[in-house]
């Protein structure tokens, strides 16, 4: 999978979504067909996210380690790689060193 460098034809919510005392910051984008994504960055930390809808997390820069709910194994993902998170679940993410830039594809 190649790295998504830009998203065309979107409306961007200018106020950022700020989570975990600023360790994760994202902006919501909406396409003309009503679908949405978020584009963000996670600073070095270990965080736990909960999901409503299924998500595909696409790495744009940096790297992270991810552990899905109910699993004991951490998997590493970098730029150009993605991982899937089921809906109504959670995942732990660890970022060390450089910030991890991502696109979250919902649904």
From Swiss-Prot:
Enzyme class at the top of the EC tree: transferase
GO MF annotation terms: guanosine phosphorylase activity; purine-nucleoside phosphorylase activity; thymidine phosphorylase activity; uridine phosphorylase activity
Enzyme Commission code: 2.4.2.1, 2.4.2.2
Keywords attached to this entry: Glycosyltransferase, Transferase
Pfam families found in the cross-reference section: Ppnp (PF06865)
Catalysed reaction equations from the record: a purine D-ribonucleoside + phosphate = a purine nucleobase + alpha-D-ribose 1-phosphate; adenosine + phosphate = alpha-D-ribose 1-phosphate + adenine; cytidine + phosphate = cytosine + alpha-D-ribose 1-phosphate; guanosine + phosphate = alpha-D-ribose 1-phosphate + guanine
GO cellular component, one term: cytosol
Family to which this protein belongs: Belongs to the nucleoside phosphorylase PpnP family.
HAMAP family assigned: Nucleos_phosphorylase_PpnP
Function: Catalyzes the phosphorolysis of diverse nucleosides, yielding D-ribose 1-phosphate and the respective free bases. Can use uridine, adenosine, guanosine, cytidine, thymidine, inosine and xanthosine as substrates. Also catalyzes the reverse reactions.
PANTHER family: PYRIMIDINE/PURINE NUCLEOSIDE PHOSPHORYLASE, PYRIMIDINE_PURINE NUCLEOSIDE PHOSPHORYLASE
Protein name (Swiss-Prot/TrEMBL): Pyrimidine/purine nucleoside phosphorylase
Source species of the chain: Azoarcus sp. (strain BH72)
Lineage: Bacteria, Pseudomonadati, Pseudomonadota, Betaproteobacteria, Rhodocyclales
């Amino acid at each position: 999978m190649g790295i998504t460098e830009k998203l065309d034809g979107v409306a961007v919510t200018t106020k950022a979504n700020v989570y975990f005392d600023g360790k994760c910051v994202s902006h919501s984008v909406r396409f003309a067909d009503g679908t949405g994504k978020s584009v963000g960055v996670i600073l070095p930390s270990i965080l736990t996210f909960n999901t409503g809808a299924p998500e595909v997390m696409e790495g744009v820069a940096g790297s992270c380690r991810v552990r899905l709910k109910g699993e004991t194994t951490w998997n590493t993902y970098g730029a150009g790689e993605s991982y899937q998170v089921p809906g109504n679940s959670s995942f732990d993410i660890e970022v060390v060193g450089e910030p991890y830039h991502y696109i979250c594809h919902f649904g």
